[in-house]
Each structure stands twice: as C-alpha cells, then as structure tokens.
Design a protein with these regions (language model features):
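Basic, glycine-rich
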Residues: 347-412
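Active-site-adjacent loop/helix micro-motif of nuclease/hydrolase catalytic cores
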Residues: 182, 195-200, 330-338, 364
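Short, small-residue-biased leader/transition segments that mark boundaries at the very start
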Residues: 3-4, 421-425
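Active-site metal-binding core of divalent-cation-utilizing nuclease and nuclease-like domains
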Residues: 286-318
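Metal-dependent nuclease catalytic cores in nucleic-acid-processing enzymes
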Residues: 213-227, 339-354
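Short beta-strand-loop-alpha-helix junction that forms the active-site gateway
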Residues: 308-344, 361
C-alpha cells in the first residue's frame, strides 16, 4: 500500500484546544473545565520523530521573550538582542485601586489606566504607528475595558476612525482567545489583586488550573516592540505556600521580572570557551583604550553579539556590534546562517554590525582597530525613542531575584515540535 507523510506542527508550551468557554455561563474563578487532548500531545506520547524549530523572530527586543525562554523553553529558543538591549521593553505600572472580588470581579483602576494609554498613544502622531493589543486574565475584565474604550471612541470619533482604518486595529482579548495574535505594543491587565480590604486570594481563575502556565506563556509573548503590565497586585503579595499552581508561580516570577528586568539564566546558556573569552576580552580592552564603553557577550540565549560598543551620546544603546568567529560560528549549522541570516536579522533589529576574524586580529591588531574605529565613525545614529509611560527596568540576565530558584524550573515539554506521521492508504 502507498504511504503518505504528514507533518504535525505545534507548540506544546502553548494552548491546546480548550472547552473553557463551551458553556454560555462560566464562573472563571471556580471552573474546573480541562483542556482537550490534542493530536500533538498524542504524537509526543508515542515518541514520533521530532524536529525543534528554535529561531524566534517576533520580538524585536530580546527582553520581550526572555522570561518565556528561560521559564518555559529552558533557554533553547535562539533569540537575538537588539541595539537598545541595555533597557528592558517590559515595564509595569501599579494603578491605585483594588480587585472587586465579591461583586463585579472587575478591576476598574487597571481598566481605566489601559484605556487612557490607548487614547494617549492614538493621539500621538508618532506613537499611533505602533499597533496595540490588550490582554486580560478574564473575560469580565476584557468586557470592562472594551466598554470603557467604546465610551472614549464616542468622545474621540477621529481616533476611532484612525483605528478602524489601521491594518492592525486595537484588539482586546483574554487568555483563552489571544493565542496566535500579536501587536507592536501589548497592554496586559492582570485584573486580580487585593480586594477592598487588602486581602489577596490565590485564585487566579484559569491560571490555577493544570496547564494554566501555558496561558501565561501565551499572554506574555504577544508583543513585537514593547509590553506594559498593569497590576494592582505586586509580586510579593503572591504567597506560593498557599498554592501549588505552576501558573501562579509563573505569574509571580513574571511580575518580578517586569519590575526589575532581571532573570536567572542557567550556566550552560552563557558559558563561552576560554579561548573565545580571551580574544573577546583583548579586543574589548583595546576598544576601551580608544575611549568607548564596551559590553561583551550580549544576549540571553545561545546567540551572542560578542562585543557591543555603547553610543557615547546615548548610553542606552549600542553604536556598533562586533561578531567574532567563535561560539556563534559553532552554533550555526550553515554558512548562510553565519554570514547572511544572522547579520541580516541583527541589522533588522537596528544593529550596525562589523565582523572581525580572529586570525586578522593576531596578524595585525592595529589594522583591525583601525577598521573598528572607521566603522564607529561611519555608524548611523538611531532616533531617540519616545519616553515610556513608566520607568523601564535595567535589563540584565546574570542575577537571581529570589532566594529559591525552584520557582523558575522549566516545564516538561520541548518547544516548537514538528512530528512526522506515516499513514498507510487502505
């Protein structure tokens, strides 16, 4: 009989089919409905041949995917740092307010802050070029923000018209239906938090369920350029001794990251060979002697920009990035990846890139330094970015922000799985 080859593509770290909203009336906090079985899970269970797709392209700033990569993908996604990698693009705002747990299950303070930010961005000729998406934990909070925005559209019909004509209009979605969507800027309303008496429940609706961490992973990986988290809840108010939910533990870690911009990264993802480190340090030292600020091994995944030269006129950005023929070369399977694709991706993220060969450095250091100086002098400057709505955290990938690292253990499936199924025709 003939055999047909089938490819099943999916990500077991994100949402499988769900029956969460199969009922017309759902109590999100107390629902015990489960995710449905997926064909992908069946393929994994019987150990079919698999191929992992590791390159990540959506996020134009590495901080936007850094938490998911570390927490859920075991740092196996290959991500690329951007030229302004010194500042995190995940920020957090804590509005003054509370979560109305007993009655409406709404958080009006967060909803108001989200809608105000939408109107502010749509009213700015430059900011309105970035598309906007709103993500909420619950459908109740989603509906509240939707209603508030409709009221604002009525007061600003010209802004509603601009949004209507946009190729990517504003969307407002919850955890259950945002998968597959993306926008330049994501505004994330947590919703849950202290009630009017200041008491915090450890019930976060669908996040508490088995697999709730998948919902969090979906929610925090929708942004291309920036993510602003709105939360009356602070990470220290989440008591993990009162819950065993992986989703709640993930939320606590993400709120800490949004506040501090720091991640705990496993040692294997940042280790470089001694010879590579020596060459990198020698070149970096020589550049420092020219009077420039320098940072080495930039990036939170396996891929690194070996040396970044900080712009003396804007210390939040790199003026030039240098790639050496070391670890990055070993991690690239083809010459096209090394010499075409990687520099192309970095150029698209705003980098000015110069490649330096180790043998050239040992052969004629002065000539290589001259080439570096010429590249610095000719590097185009980047436009100053608009001041964000909240002070961004300094982005680092070298420190733990909690005493116990167990809360940051990786999940149990591999990322981006492609399985082959052989089907015999009867």
């Amino acid at each position: 009989s003939d055999v047909y080859k089938r490819q099943i593509v999916g990500d077991p770290k994100q949402l499988p089919p769900t029956n969460f909203f199969s009922s017309n009336r759902i109590d999100e906090e107390n629902s015990e409905k489960e995710d449905l079985e997926s064909l992908l899970d069946d393929c994994l269970a019987i150990s079919m041949p698999q191929q992992y797709l590791k390159w990540h392209y959506r996020s134009r700033h590495e901080s936007l995917i850094a938490y998911s990569n570390m927490k859920y993908y075991d740092n196996k996604l290959l991500t690329f740092p951007s030229h302004n990698d010194l500042i995190s693009k995940v920020s957090i705002i804590h509005p003054e307010g509370h979560y109305d747990k007993g009655r409406t299950k709404q958080n009006k303070a967060e909803a108001r802050a989200v809608v105000d930010e939408i109107i502010r961005r749509m009213s700015d000729e430059k900011l309105r070029n970035d598309s906007i998406g709103v993500v909420t934990f619950s459908s109740v909070q989603q509906n509240l923000i939707d209603d508030m925005l409709c009221e604002e559209w009525a007061n600003h019909p010209e802004l509603e018209e601009l949004d209507r004509k946009s190729p990517e209009p504003v969307f407002i979605k919850n955890l259950e239906n945002v998968q597959g969507d993306e926008r330049d800027v994501i505004l994330f309303s947590v919703g849950y938090g202290p009630d009017e008496k200041g008491q915090v429940s450890m019930n976060f609706g669908p996040l508490n369920r088995d697999g709730g961490w998948r919902r969090l992973n979906v929610a925090i990986s929708r942004a291309r350029k920036a993510m602003i988290v709105y939360s009356v809840l602070r990470p220290e108010q989440i008591d993990l001794s009162r819950t065993r939910s992986e989703g709640v533990a993930g939320l606590k870690g993400f709120l800490e990251f949004a506040e501090r911009g720091k991640l705990a990264v496993t040692a294997h993802s940042t280790t470089k060979s001694t010879s590579d480190s020596t060459v990198t340090e020698c070149i970096a030292k020589a550049i420092k002697e020219l009077g420039y600020g320098v940072k080495c091994n930039i990036g939170s995944s396996e891929f690194k920009v070996d040396i970044g030269i900080i712009d003396p006129d804007n210390e939040k950005e790199y003026l030039l990035g240098i790639l050496l023929d070391g670890e990055n070369t070993l991690h690239s399977s083809t010459a096209q990846d090394r010499f075409i694709l990687q520099p192309s991706v970095l150029n698209g993220l705003g980098w000015n890139i110069l490649r330096v060969w180790t043998l050239d450095w040992f052969d004629d250091k002065d000539r290589v330094l001259g080439n570096i100086k010429a590249a610095i002098d000719s590097a185009p400057k980047h436009e100053a970015e608009t001041v964000p709505t909240s002070k961004p955290a300094v982005y680092s990938t070298s420190q733990f922000e909690r005493e116990e690292a167990s809360a940051l253990t990786s999940a149990f499936a591999q990322p981006y799985v492609l399985s082959l199924i052989h089907i015999s025709e009867p």
